[in-house]
Amino acid sequence: MSQSLIVALDFPGKQDVEQFLRHFEGEELFVKVGMELFYKEGPAIITYLKEKGHKIFLDLKLHDIPNTVKSAMRSLASLDVDMVNVHAAGGSSMMKAAIEGLEEGKQEGKERPICIAVTQLTSTSEAMMKKEIGIEKTLEEAVAHYAKLTKESGLDGVVCSTLEVPKLREVCGDEFVTVTPGIRLASDDVNDQVRVATPKRARELGSSYIVVGRSITKAENPLEAYKTVKQQWEGVTV
């Protein structure tokens, strides 16, 4: 299950990434590259990480008209990334176009990247969703609606809170991928995410993948922190 632990490389540039990865010589990680790092370094950072043997979740949360998303996904698939995402709010046509682009752009002999959709950001509270976004549903209802739309559109799963996983299993089935950010060790601050959980709790609730950032990247000893998270996630008693 260690490959289902994704480390968020939330750094401003390649130099910071290189410094961080020195702690992990010989480890093949599954890493997340987000907007800040990708927009600074471009596709070269993907090439660098692939050459190091790491799997990559390219977290750009595409949300645009279908043709634009299709073309963008074609380009991203050609980079040999392992996972990408879109905003479910972009609608079914956009999500279907994303899959088409990934199929067209994937490298010969390889499967297309896993494609998931963001239902609601983990920084979104129900009050914010209703007052600012204008969705007159409960947060649980809105997430379930987007997850169902995502599955019907042919995507593999969603980004969601761990707390939403059991409901989404009911709505979309056990094969539906759930990628859960907002994972913290019990001793950590929650920072800017409202809906958070520990690795142990994520495992108990049935998450497919967990995304862990600051608990590892800001630790005094990142490798030891990684091992701690991994043990909790895998249910290993030491």
Swiss-Prot record:
Gene3D superfamilies: Aldolase class I. SUPFAM superfamilies: Ribulose-phoshate binding barrel. GO terms for molecular function: orotidine-5'-phosphate decarboxylase activity. Pfam families: OMPdecase. One of its GO terms (cellular component) is cytosol. The keyword Lyase applies. This is Orotidine 5'-phosphate decarboxylase. Keywords: Decarboxylase, Lyase, Pyrimidine biosynthesis. The lineage of its organism: Bacteria, Bacillati, Bacillota, Bacilli, Bacillales. It comes from Bacillus cereus (strain AH187). PANTHER family: OROTIDINE 5'-PHOSPHATE DECARBOXYLASE (PTHR32119:SF2). Substrate binds at residues 10, 32, 59-68, 122, 184, 193, 213-214. Belongs to the OMP decarboxylase family. Type 1 subfamily. It catalyses: orotidine 5'-phosphate + H(+) = UMP + CO2. GO terms for biological process: 'de novo' pyrimidine nucleobase biosynthetic process; 'de novo' UMP biosynthetic process. InterPro entries: Aldolase_TIM, OMPdecase, OMPdecase_AS, OMPdecase_bac, OMPdeCOase_dom, RibuloseP-bd_barrel. Homodimer. The active site is at K61. Catalyzes the decarboxylation of orotidine 5'-monophosphate (OMP) to uridine 5'-monophosphate (UMP). Its EC number is 4.1.1.23. Pathway: Pyrimidine metabolism; UMP biosynthesis via de novo pathway; UMP from orotate: step 2/2.
